[in-house]
Amino acid sequence: TSSKKDYIEIPVSFATDRNDTKDDDLNERFGTKRADLQYGRTVVSIPYTHKLGEIERPSYWRLEFSEDASKHVMIQSIKKQDKETYFNQMAERIAKNGKSTFLFVHGYNVSFADAARRAAQITFDLRFGGEPVFYSWPSQGATTLYTVDEANIEWAKHNMKNFLRDYLTRSKADDIYLVAHSMGNRGLTKALIELMNENPELKDKITEVILAAPDIDADVFRRDIAPKMVQKIAKPITLYVSADDLALIASRKVHGNPRAGDAGKGVVIVKGIETIDASGVDTSFLSHSYFATTSTIIADILDLIKSGKRATDR
């Protein structure tokens, strides 16, 4: 084997309320049970052969049975930190790296390792030069355990609010982007609304909120969540929706009502929130991670983050 690395390493900060399994297998290091908030850094490698929007993984079809850093996106290390060290070092890095950061909150059916790889892929594909951070709540990482995930995102909301307070206060960034996907939107929106009630001054720390394919009841979103978000945050909020989103269509069937991210029954339009219809540009399996896997959406988010331009100007 060559001594030259054929991958790039992306360090990512994390906060999680999953149980620490202490497993030597880094893909299994944090489990599916609830725990107190923990903090740390993970390094994820992305191969030079990486294609925009992909998270390359071993494929049985290609007779790949183990991870290979020259071909696959994989976790290289996970290091826990105490809270003080975590936020102090984060602020130091942000001061050096363009004073910007994003927080990614994943959705349903996602493991800690999935979330780490996704956060690194978003960082790499968006050519984001600031501090990437992800919050991993105890999703079961299984399509069949939807209702367990629903209960756990509701439980995690309190921890998420406390983390957001520290993150907004202590990261010392000039630009903070908050990004939630799928069911993660339930946690982020509720945590933000509660936090803004308690600490309204923190809204000045937020640059933009991106709600990708929210798995939230569309009527509840329109009536209860969106107006409060617009009023309390008073910063740009972008909603990405799609009519092709299979996970949201399935969720609509489970709940009997459309979801806020599902454009199939009409696009959710709310005063003060910019809605981007991503229908028809989606190529991803299960059609649910289009915000991170479709190059046009990546280009749109990149433009949003780099320029702050609104949709009509992009």
How would you name each of these model-derived features?
Residues 160, 180-188, 193:
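Gly/Ala-rich beta-loop-alpha elbow adjacent to hydrolase catalytic centers
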Residues 100:
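Alpha/beta-hydrolase fold active-site loops
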Residues 110-115:
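Short substrate-entry loop that stabilizes the transition state in hydrolases
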Residues 103-107, 181, 213:
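The conserved beta1-alpha1 loop
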Residues 1-81, 85-96, 116-175, 192-208, ...:
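Lipolytic serine-hydrolase domain surface
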